[in-house]
């Protein structure tokens, strides 16, 4: 007759779950190396931040190249309409221009410009479907049409006079671009982006060599042409 054990049962040997103990391997998400964007931005322009008139606008395209997981270089072409008012003391036309013989009180302007920006972007925060970024760069301005209205006194009476110029001066690397923004992937190769910005003059632009500043917000629809980079999330 077999004897039954009378002592306490032997402790069970715990078997480690190899799946649970294995270290988590980060998964990679694809990031577009080359993207194209359609852009629109309302903006306000001012000379020395003294006054504002009606808003202007920017419409254009941008090509963006990601050369590192958090770094991108972009170039674009924008058709820009800038409206501003300047004091006569901030408007400096060529020496022989007629306004130099009068005391100009104010100049109102509407300028149609080709803006060629070159910007460097850094992603401050990256998530699976979104990114927060900051950007810095420079713009070259090509003056296509400049329309001016001058206000001054003639023999004690207020006078307004208009004048326009087509295909005026070009100003290379004349604007400093600063911006920050938020990008979100919609699905597939599409993304949207919102980007508040300021443009700070590095020199005078236009016929009157005014120090023109602008502020606004770009809204962009982006499409990935070359999705080839991956980063861990």
What are the residue ranges of the model-derived segments?
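Residues on the lipid-exposed face of transmembrane beta-strands in outer-membrane beta-barrel proteins
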Residues: 38-42, 61-67, 77-79, 118-122, ...
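Sequence/structural signature of outer-membrane beta-barrel proteins
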Residues: 41-49, 82-84, 125-127, 143-145, ...
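Conserved catalytic residues of ABC-type ATPase nucleotide-binding domains
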Residues: 1-73, 80-84, 90-91
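C-terminal soluble domains/tails of integral membrane proteins
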Residues: 127, 135, 154-161, 196-198
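Outer membrane beta-barrel transmembrane domains
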Residues: 162-174, 185-187, 214-233
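Repeated loop/turn-to-beta-strand initiation elements of outer-membrane beta-barrel proteins
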Residues: 70-73, 128-130, 187-192, 227-231
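Extracellular/periplasm-exposed beta-strand and loop segments of Gram-negative cell-envelope proteins
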Residues: 52, 82-112, 143-171, 208-210
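Residues that define the transmembrane beta-barrel architecture of outer-membrane proteins
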Residues: 32, 53-57, 110-116, 130, ...
């Amino acid at each position: 007759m077999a004897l039954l054990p009378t002592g306490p049962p032997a402790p069970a040997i715990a078997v480690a779950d190899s799946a649970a103990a294995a270290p988590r391997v980060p998964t990679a998400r694809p990031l577009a190396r080359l993207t194209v964007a359609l852009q629109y931005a309302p903006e306000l322009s001012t000379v020395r931040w003294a006054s504002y008139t009606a808003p202007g606008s920017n419409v254009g395209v941008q090509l963006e190249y990601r050369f590192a997981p958090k770094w991108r270089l972009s170039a674009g072409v924008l058709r820009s309409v800038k409206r501003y008012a300047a004091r006569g003391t901030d408007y400096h036309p060529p020496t022989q221009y007629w306004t130099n013989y009068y005391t100009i009180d104010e100049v109102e302007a509407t300028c149609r410009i080709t803006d060629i920006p070159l910007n460097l972007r850094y992603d401050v925060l990256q998530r699976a479907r979104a990114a927060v970024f900051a950007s810095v760069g420079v713009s070259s301005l090509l003056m296509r049409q400049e329309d001016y209205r001058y206000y001054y006194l003639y023999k004690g009476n207020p006078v307004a006079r208009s004048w326009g110029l087509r295909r005026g001066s070009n100003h290379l690397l004349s604007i400093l671009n600063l911006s920050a923004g938020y990008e979100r992937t919609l699905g597939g190769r599409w993304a949207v982006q919102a980007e508040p910005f300021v443009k700070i003059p590095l020199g005078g632009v236009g016929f009157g060599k005014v120090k023109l500043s602008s502020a606004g917000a770009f809204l962009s629809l982006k499409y990935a042409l070359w999705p080839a980079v991956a980063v861990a999330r």
